[in-house]
């Protein structure tokens, strides 16, 4: 879970987009893969993982939540992918992780449409596995953790690995270029316009360039 009001509110965009200090493409590609490696480390670890999700899961924070095995949502939880509104695609292997939970149309609504989905919708869509009052979130997450910790660890690990392999058999083949797509989209005029509009609290005017 996150500290404070939110699970993870995502990147700080007030720096104009950020990026590595070294401008060489080879270093930008290396830097951009850090989040992907963190996502896969969570998704592929042997242990069962449970997100205790309060407040926002935005962008990379939403990717982290979907990388876990289960998500317990507080009644104030919500999800949003703001990447589309800042002129870039979603990376960190986040697209297939969401697709497996919510399905194609809902994934498009969230990622291409930038919609915000709140607790009851997330439960209905299968993104979260349980919905509880905020005050009961951590106790419920601990109950789930205790339940799975009592299971045979070897069998549980093999089941988790097999389910992940079956569900995501095409994920890497399709999404292996999402980092490069993000780097490309970050160089566009539309990306610069999106950041300008975000900082100015104005509506962007995209040109498709």
Where are the model-predicted features located?
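Crotonase-fold acyl-CoA enzyme core
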Residues: 40-154, 180, 188, 193
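Short beta-strand->loop
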Residues: 169-175
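Amphipathic alpha-helical segments used for helix-helix packing
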Residues: 155-161
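Glycine- (often His-adjacent) and acidic-residue-rich active-site loop
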Residues: 2-40, 87, 170
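Terminal low-complexity tails and localization/encapsulation signals of metabolic enzymes
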Residues: 196-209
